[in-house]
């Protein structure tokens, strides 16, 4: 799918919860522990802990969302580095705020009762937690409706 010519209509940052912030400290703790072991003379212990710090830090940096974006023909979840998840409007049924418990692909960054669910026509829904759920859903559904209207007018299905 090529989305490079799309216009960005709205974007929101994820709101990070306390638990996730504490989890993000783990690589730093491993790094400090590795440094402490090295300075205390335990080089092998330091070298054993260092890869864990680097790998866990890299994984966290790559998979945690940076931005949730609404384009004129798709939604994009920007992850670390060059990675992102793009869902075209042709694959989306609706975007809604929900509190239901269900099996979803999660790009949530906090534990909360209400989250935004991107309901797909086929496959698993996607759960996200933007800073402002209401505004994100409003913009996403407005863009989805406009895209559907344009598709009907041009005869593309």
What is the role of each PLM region?
Residues 145-157:
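Cytosol-/stroma-facing membrane-proximal "stalk/adaptor" domains immediately downstream
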Residues 35-42, 60-63:
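Transmembrane helix-loop junctions and nearby membrane-interface residues
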Residues 1-39, 113-117, 121-125, 157:
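N-terminal membrane-targeting/pre-transmembrane regions
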Residues 41-53:
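Hydrophobic alpha-helical transmembrane segments
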Residues 78-135, 155-157:
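Non-transmembrane, membrane-adjacent beta-strand/coil modules in membrane-associated proteins
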Residues 52-89:
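Conserved beta-hairpin
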């Amino acid at each position: 799918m090529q989305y490079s010519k799309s216009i960005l209509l709205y974007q929101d940052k994820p709101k990070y919860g306390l638990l996730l912030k504490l989890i993000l400290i783990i690589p730093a703790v491993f790094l400090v522990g590795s440094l402490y072991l090295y300075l205390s003379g335990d080089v092998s212990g330091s070298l054993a802990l260092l890869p864990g710090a680097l790998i866990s830090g890299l994984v966290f940096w790559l998979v945690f969302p940076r931005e949730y974006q609404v384009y004129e023909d798709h939604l994009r979840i920007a992850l670390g580095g060059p990675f992102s998840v793009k869902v075209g409007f042709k694959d989306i049924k609706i975007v809604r705020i929900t509190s239901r418990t269900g099996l979803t692909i999660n790009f949530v960054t906090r534990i909360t009762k209400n989250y935004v669910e991107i309901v797909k026509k086929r496959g698993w829904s996607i759960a996200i937690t933007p800073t402002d759920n209401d505004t994100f859903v409003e913009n996403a559904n407005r863009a989805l409706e406009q895209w559907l209207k344009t598709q009907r007018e041009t005869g593309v299905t």
